[in-house]
């Protein structure tokens, strides 16, 4: 990975989900869950977004070349299931961050694991990245399990990074390297 810019976001297709480049056409689906309290809790989002902020964000990510944002779509029903993002491009070190947010009702079906596997296949085979990292709150055990299934390993823990209604949550740092063993859908 030498370029400071990514190629245009590609559509990625797996057995049960399709990842479409995220853009303004996804406003209604995004708006339907972006301020959902449980989604906010799991992602650590403390902002209540306005419709205008969501529209501006979707327009910006559609043309960004330092990140790739996808809508997660169920291939059978065409239902929007969330979004997944490769961001924080470090071209010198061929690394990026990944984050995923599933819409209410989507978790627990393998959708997130499949979407993550598709993005990792793309990151390592097409973008030639060396490392993809993420962080997840310690209380989000289901997400941690999904990330391990996709090939991520725990690299560390940052203590008490997020205040919850019950106290403090730690952030678990996870990453996967291009040559780490992991499942593939290709």
Task: State where each predicted segment sits.
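GNAT-family acyltransferases
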Residues: 1-106, 168-169, 173-186
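Conserved acetyl-CoA-binding loop-helix of GNAT-fold acetyltransferases
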Residues: 102, 108-123, 144-149
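Glycine-centered helix-boundary capping/hinge motifs
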Residues: 108-110, 128, 151, 166
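Non-catalytic cap/lid and distal C-terminal segments of serine-dependent acyl enzymes
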Residues: 72, 82, 113, 132, ...
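Conserved catalytic-core motifs of GNAT/GCN5-like acyltransferases
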Residues: 22, 133-136, 153-173
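Amphipathic alpha-helical recognition patches that constitute DNA-binding helices
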Residues: 29, 97, 114, 131, ...
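Conserved GNAT acetyl-CoA-binding A-motif
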Residues: 125-135
């Amino acid at each position: 990975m030498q370029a400071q810019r990514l190629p245009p976001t590609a559509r990625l297709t797996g057995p049960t989900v399709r990842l479409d480049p995220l853009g303004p056409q996804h406003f209604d689906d995004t708006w339907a869950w972006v301020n959902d309290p449980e989604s906010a809790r799991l992602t650590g989002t403390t902002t209540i977004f306005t419709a205008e902020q969501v529209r501006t964000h979707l327009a910006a990510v559609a043309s960004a070349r330092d990140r790739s944002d996808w809508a997660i779509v169920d291939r059978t029903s065409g239902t929007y299931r969330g979004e997944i993002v490769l961001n924080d491009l470090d071209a010198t070190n061929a690394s990026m961050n990944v984050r995923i947010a599933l819409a209410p009702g989507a978790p627990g079906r393998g959708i997130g694991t499949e979407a993550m596997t598709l993005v990792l296949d793309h990151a390592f085979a097409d973008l030639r990245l060396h490392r993809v990292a993420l962080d997840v709150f310690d209380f989000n055990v289901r997400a941690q399990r999904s990330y391990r299934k996709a090939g991520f390993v725990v690299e560390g823990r940052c203590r008490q990074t997020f205040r919850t209604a019950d106290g403090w949550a730690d952030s678990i740092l996870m990453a996967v390297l291009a040559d780490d063993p992991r499942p593939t859908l290709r």
